[in-house]
Amino acid sequence: MRLIFSITIIILFTFNITAREIGETEITTEDGIEVFQDEKYYLLKKNVKILSDNFNLNAKNVKINFDKSLYDITELNAKGEVNFVSPKFGLNSKSETLKFEVISEKLRVDGKNSELITKDIEMYSDGFIEVNNLNGDFKLEGLNSKLINESIFIKAEKIEGVFSNIENQKEITFLNVIDKKISYVKNNNTEMYAKKINFDNKTSIIELIDNVVIIRNGEKIIGDYGTLDTKNNSYKIKSNNDTKVKVVIQNNE
C-alpha cells in the first residue's frame, strides 16, 4: 500500500520544528514524503532535514525504515551531501551516502572525502568507513583512508580492527592494515612502513610484513619482516636473504 503526502506534511513538519518536544522526530523536505505503510518506510525527497533526540541528519534524499508501529526508526539510508550528528552515539560524519542501523548502532558512510569522527578517533576515506558502535568493529577501505587519534596515525588502502572502551576512551586493541603499495603507521616516536601491519593488544606485538621500514630515535632499519614489542620497547627486523644479519635493537629508556 502506498500513500503519498506532500504539501500537507511539509507544512506540518515545518511547523513542528519551532516546538519539537522530547520523543518527537521532526522532518522537513522540499519535495514531500512518500509513506509505504505495508513496507514500513518513508521516502523523503530533496534537501531533507531530520531532528530527533538521538541524531540530526541533513541530506538530499533519505529513506527511513520504521518498526511495526511506524513510530521508532530502525534504519536510515541517505544520499547526497550527507551530514550526520549523534551526541547519543558519539558519532559525527560527512559523506556522499550513509546507512545507519539504529538498534545495532552500525554506521557506514561511502564516497569521496567521507569522514567519521568520534570523541577519540578521526577516520577519513575516499571509499567507505564502517563502525559498529556496540562491539567496536571498524573498517576503512579505499584511496586516502586514514585513522587518527592522540597517539597513532594510520594511512593505507585498507584499515580494519576493533576499538575497546578503556577508562572511558576508545583504544585500538586489534588492527590489520593492508596496502598493495605501502602502509604507514606512526605510533608515538616510531614510524613504520610495510605492505601489511598487524597489531594485537593481547600480545602487545606489532607485526610488519613485506617492504618493512622502521624509523625510530634517528635510526632507520629496512627488511622484509619485522616485529615491534610495545611492552618492552624493542623491535626486530629480518630479511628473506639468509646472508644478511638480523637486527635487534632495544631501547630501555
Language model regions located:
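Mature-chain termini and adjacent capping regions
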Residues: 1-5, 13-253
